[in-house]
Each structure stands twice: as C-alpha cells, then as structure tokens.
Amino acid sequence: MVKTTAPAFATGRSLGATSIRTDHGVTVVAIKRPGEGFTYAAADTILHPGDTIIVSGKVRDTERFAELS
C-alpha cells in the first residue's frame, strides 16, 4: 500500500468513472480530505485536489501510480 495525493487526471470525477484500476493496476482503498480523517473509498466517491489517498496493488504499480501525483 502507498499513501499519495490524488492525481490531477482523476480529480472532479468519481472513482468509478476513472480508469485507475484498469490503467494503473491499483485500487484506491481510502481517502483523506484536508482536516478530516480517512474514509473508505467507494465507486461513487469524488476525488478532490489535495485529497490524500491510499492505494493497494503490486509494489511496482503502486510506486508508479504515486509518481503521477
């Protein structure tokens, strides 16, 4: 698992509408908004600029995804 920020290409969209899992091989499992605690991610969760996200997947995939932020 890797903690990173939401990449610009995914902000303003629901997780279900992004291609994060398909294109990058990672799953967003939790989201933390500034001033709030972590919450579980769902398909209808909208990512916002500045969100911290936890992603899971293969080490190589999670590290590559983190570099997009």
Q: Regions from the language model: what does each represent?
A:
Residues 6-69:
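Cytosolic Rossmann-like ligand/nucleotide-binding regulatory domains
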Residues 1-5:
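Short glycine-/aliphatic-rich beta-strand segments at the starts of folded cytosolic domains
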